[in-house]
Amino acid sequence: MTNIRKSHPLMKIINNSFIDLPAPSNISSWWNFGSLLGVCLMLQILTGLFLAMHYTSDTMTAFNSVTHICRDVSYGWTLRYLHANGASMFFICLYLHVGRGIYYGSYTYSETWNIGIILLFTVMATAFMGYVLPWGQMSFWGATVITNLLSAIPYIGTNLVEWIWGGFSVDKATLTRFFAFHFLFPFIISAMVMVHLLFLHETGSNNPMGIPSNVDMIPFHPYYTIKDILGVLLMIMVLSTLVLFSPDMLGDPDNYIPANPLNTPPHIKPEWYFLFAYAILRSIPNKLGGVLALTLSILILVIIPMLHMSKQRSMIFRPLSQCLFWLLVADLLILTWIGGQPVEHPYIIIGQLASILYFSIIIILMPLINFMENYLLKW
């Protein structure tokens, strides 16, 4: 008799995706972040669902409803901080996942890579809308500043902003629609994740060597299920420590002040995971230029496969490319730091130099180094 997991139509899909899936025998812990992202997404949907049961998307009561969740709902504070810090964990895993894709050349699977970029954009949009919901000072002013950037689009900009706001300023209509979209998007993300996995399983996983691994595959279960569970446990430990000991470490104190359209905070800044893009936006003293640079800072990932000039896929045997990769990582950390600083000397010039370096590394230096390495290897 055939095993039910191999014969049942639904079980067969699960079996071919998570149990009998042939996986390269040498993939390292850098390949754990896909499963960690799945866990983060499930955690966010679950905690978000329970938070939505108590939250009210009205400008008069939104701030108080979040306070009510923290004070009066049983374990409401845990839910709220798990959701807020879960978003931070989500982005840490996302950035590491993308970084691993760049380092090991996984971007050569173009369908998987492009769906991943769309996923990144969708998650960023979801996180931004979620940040507006508590209706604190930084929520309100963050929403005002970021949505206002669309007014830089010629001809239709102003109309577009007012259409998104649902009025002439960020108000009740804006909050209600942001809540609706924030609730809807994670389910769209879940569907896109399935497409992401579908494309990945068409080609099979990449591996640290960047060479075909068809000759040496092992079943996903039990080898990588055990490995993924270890990663999940470590992430839960970090998240629990954050939630239980310093839940507000990554947040902004200004968001504990109710939104006031008449009082602007001294430094308007987004959550920490958007600071690198915010620094790139601020480094250009022109509104439209800044918006274009902001969009391109993420959209540049699309052209990375086209700029791959090396005869080798992975960076594991390319020390010059490795140096450039880690320079890019350091540059992104500098941009993240600059994004949280006030707009004054010397932060302005540091931000501008870091922004130029960011685009230069990806567009100019990476392909040049690839050609150089090919020449050194006489290929």
From Swiss-Prot:
It is found in: Mitochondrion inner membrane. Component of the ubiquinol-cytochrome c reductase complex (complex III or cytochrome b-c1 complex) that is part of the mitochondrial respiratory chain. The b-c1 complex mediates electron transfer from ubiquinol to cytochrome c. Contributes to the generation of a proton gradient across the mitochondrial membrane that is then used for ATP synthesis. It is a multi-pass membrane protein. This is Cytochrome b. Belongs to the cytochrome b family. One of its GO terms (cellular component) is respiratory chain complex III. Binds 2 heme b groups non-covalently. Heme 1 (or BL or b562) is low-potential and absorbs at about 562 nm, and heme 2 (or BH or b566) is high-potential and absorbs at about 566 nm. One of its GO terms (molecular function) is metal ion binding. Its main location: mitochondrion. Its cofactor is heme b. Keywords: Electron transport, Heme, Iron, Membrane, Metal-binding, Mitochondrion, Mitochondrion inner membrane, Respiratory chain, Transmembrane, Transmembrane helix, Transport, Ubiquinone. A ubiquinone binds at H201. The cytochrome bc1 complex contains 11 subunits: 3 respiratory subunits (MT-CYB, CYC1 and UQCRFS1), 2 core proteins (UQCRC1 and UQCRC2) and 6 low-molecular weight proteins (UQCRH/QCR6, UQCRB/QCR7, UQCRQ/QCR8, UQCR10/QCR9, UQCR11/QCR10 and a cleavage product of UQCRFS1). This cytochrome bc1 complex then forms a dimer.
